[in-house]
């Protein structure tokens, strides 16, 4: 898996490692390893520093518990959606900064629904 990061994000990755610095990327990698049956060996995560083109590399062992948690979460979301349930939102108002820039804002908040 390869990502491109700015210098600030890059320094944090170097200092703390993938699991702590970029938990979303670590989760994505765990799911890939699980569903592509690549769990027996560590995955190679690489990142390029967009500002100076330096390369970061880290061997990431398979985190089965993380992959299972995420898979269970996805199943819950899919099941709820198919049942027509509205899941709790991460924020209480549609004007929250993350909601304003979300591709799913209209669906989540019922705008135009």
Pin down the residues of each PLM region.
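Conserved catalytic cores of phosphodiester-cleaving nucleases, focusing on short active-site segments
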Residues: 1-16, 32
């Amino acid at each position: 898996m390869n990502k491109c990061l700015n210098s600030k994000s890059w320094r944090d990755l170097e200092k703390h490692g993938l699991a702590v610095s970029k938990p979303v990327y670590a989760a994505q990698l765990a799911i890939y390893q699980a569903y592509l049956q690549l769990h027996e060996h560590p995955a190679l995560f690489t990142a390029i520093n967009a500002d100076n083109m330096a390369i970061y590399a880290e061997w990431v062992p398979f985190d089965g518990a993380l992959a299972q948690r995420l898979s269970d979460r996805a199943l819950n979301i899919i099941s709820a959606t198919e049942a027509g349930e509205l899941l709790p939102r991460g924020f209480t108002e549609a004007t929250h900064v993350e909601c304003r820039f979300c591709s799913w804002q209209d669906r989540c908040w019922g705008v135009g629904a």
